[in-house]
Amino acid sequence: MESIGEGDYENPWSYQGTTFTSDDIDDFFGFVYRITNLQTGKQYIGRKYFTQRRKPRGGKGKRRVTSESDWKKYYGSSPELKADIKDFGKGLFRREIISLHKTLGKTNYEETRQLFLNNVLTESLDDGTPAYYNSNVLGRYYRKDYFESQ
């Protein structure tokens, strides 16, 4: 098996047609992304931050450490999407960054905007099943309100 060099990772995110690496983060806080199942065409839109803040192990008080998040390995939070990735394999999913943002607020806003612009709760594939893995927006609007039980 080929070794993965610095800046390379399995099934990398693409941004504007090129592979996105840690060197491209600059001062961006997070990104909005689309994951597409290349077999079915079903998609997922979400957001991810480049850093995470955690309390150090055994740490006392309010001290927190900032480190790079798991964004390179991240495949979304949808249980349905995760199940399909397990069934189909990571190679059958395209991961693309839609937009990059410098603040938490702008990242969150753009994710919500994209969810509504793409009608993730109401769009369906040719076979009538949901076109998106997203099952809710903001924990307030739900796909189940638009689709019959599957």
PLM regions: where:
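Structure-specific nucleic-acid interaction/processing domains
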Residues: 2-150
